[in-house]
Amino acid sequence: MTKREELIKLKPDNHDMRLKYYELVLKSSSLENLPGFSLPKGYRYVYYREGDKKDWIAIETSAREFVLPMEGEAAWEKYYAGKGKELEERMFFVETLDGEKVATATAFYEPRDLSGAGWLHWVAVKREYQRQGIAKALISHTLQRLKELGYPSIKIPTQTNTWVAAGMYLDFGFRPVPENAVNSREGYGILRTLTNHPALAAFEPVPYEEIWDSHMVEIEKKLREQYADLVHFRVLEENGQERILFCTQTGTGEWKKAF
């Protein structure tokens, strides 16, 4: 089988490190008619309360944003450290009637963004609770909160690796920020290839075999040769070096061998 044939046979996960990475930034200034969706029966919204950091990390890890808890701790420190009082009015969880927190999103902001836009932050649903309509309901609920907080527009940072979520944001009426549309033009072409979304008609679709990062595909292949029960992996850049973390059905680890 040729390399091209191998790539064509690949099927993307909804959070897939093998896809070429591009940062995507979407925006909407039309907040009057935001789509509304209700949670499925048996779930409810609750705000963040002190001590909920562990639940946030657990949800984001289950959704494959992280492999190791230390990644979640680092992300929390970067975005939310010292902002507990703010989070009590901005961070949502979706909870089962038994009190298990299964999804999260935050009505937040980006201090470096001088446009005054609100930012939809860190949307995630635990893996086993996906495909129930929770994400759409949570997104609409959090967007409504951003509107209540008085933001004139809303931005959403996303990426090609989470292409299913990016397509959902397009369904909500969000569109590429012009500058980002230029800088990540191939990324939007990849997104068009994967979603065929009509909002991306201005972007040339990328041939399917070219949406994949060959280095990441090779890493996944090598890991799977060693760990048949591989679930997913992440590659971190630290001081110019790659750090490869992986999760199997029985635990987590770090790949120490050279590629």
What residue ranges belong to the model's regions?
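Conserved acetyl-CoA-binding loop of GNAT-fold acetyltransferases
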Residues: 169-179
